[in-house]
Design a protein with these regions (language model features):
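Bacterial N-terminal signal peptides that target proteins for export
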Residues: 1-7
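Short amphipathic alpha-helical "recognition" segments used for binding
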Residues: 7-9, 110
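Gram-negative bacterial Sec-dependent N-terminal signal peptides
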Residues: 10-14
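C-terminal motif of bacterial Sec signal peptides marking the signal peptidase cleavage site
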Residues: 17-19
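Short, well-ordered alpha-helical
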Residues: 21-124, 155-156
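Short glycine/serine-rich loop/turn segments
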Residues: 65, 98-190
Length: 190
């Protein structure tokens, strides 16, 4: 084999290997820790908007279509908040502790931007003027409240998650079972 052919074959192999290594894998936040998510954000592997969109898409794909019914309401301002946090990241300013971490809160926590029913149809039009103390702390720390989860009416049942406002929540791993109790929506949402 001539030197030219050997050189050409070697060059093609090296270029092929290099192109395989340079392909960027799609980052997947499922089962990621807060630190892993924030590292991916800081390294530019994902934007805050992309992250929130992934979680909203997962809710749309898995919750109602699969009969889980863990989510009661989606925060219509979640992507807008994500855009603001993307701008904060670009600015180089210091980032809050829970920067861009998507959070789902139980429907008995007041949120100024979503209905709070406590699982009861009686409160179907209850839009609190302020956040609950802990929700405010989460937002101040940079978390994005993306949705609220179903709960047993008035947080009363230790056995199953059924509310007059949003119905029954099933176990995310097997819808023939219940996630149990007043926080079942949160359990299945996770």
């Amino acid at each position: 084999m001539s030197r030219f052919k050997l050189f050409s074959i070697t060059l093609v192999i090296l270029l092929t290997l290099n192109s395989c290594q340079s392909r960027q894998t799609i980052w997947n936040p499922v089962e990621s820790t807060i630190n892993e998510i924030q590292d991916a954000l800081i390294l530019g592997e994902i934007t805050c908007r992309n992250l929130v969109s992934i979680y909203l898409q997962r809710i749309e794909t898995y919750d109602k279509p699969n009969g889980i019914n863990a989510i009661t309401v989606i925060n219509s301002q979640a992507l807008e908040k994500a855009d603001k946090l993307d701008r904060l990241l670009e600015s180089g300013d210091s980032l809050p502790e829970l920067f861009c971490i998507p959070i789902i809160v139980k429907d008995n926590f007041d949120t100024h931007d979503m209905v709070t029913t406590g699982g009861s149809v009686v409160l179907r039009d209850s839009y609190p003027p302020d956040d609950a103390f802990m929700v405010g702390k989460l937002r101040d720390a940079g978390a994005i409240i993306i949705a609220k989860s179903n709960m047993a009416e008035w947080a009363f049942s230790p056995r199953e998650t059924v509310s007059s406002s949003f119905g029954r929540t099933a176990n995310a791993y097997d819808i023939n079972f219940v996630p149990a109790g007043s926080s079942g929506g949160t359990a299945s949402a996770v």
